[in-house]
């Protein structure tokens, strides 16, 4: 989507993670590999905050893409659809090796006028490492340009 500066999924953020979520059947999938700068205390594990970021972004991108699908439109078509996270519950199950490819899976479990809920799973090394329930709401275009005081 144009003009997306999100640190996790924004293509327009030169310092971001550039996470890209795509549909594979009835779920979304994203693949990403960490770098040493994203380490936890031990340098061989991914930081928990980074894990939360990729789960959050994958969940919200899934919700946005699902909204476009429900309207029969391509992602990014005007008028653009944007969502913002309202709640997220993360369960850290196992450490994530810093050099392992992370595979994210997203499944929409609820979508209505009050928002969208996505269940996300983070796998690495063939094992489930974390999971999250991400709730987001559709926001007006003015949300992207608002000044918060």
Each model region followed by its residue ranges:
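Hydrophobic beta-strand-centered segment that forms part of the acyl-chain substrate-binding groove
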Residues: 59-103
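A conserved, well-ordered hydrophobic junction motif at loop->secondary-structure transitions
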Residues: 29-66
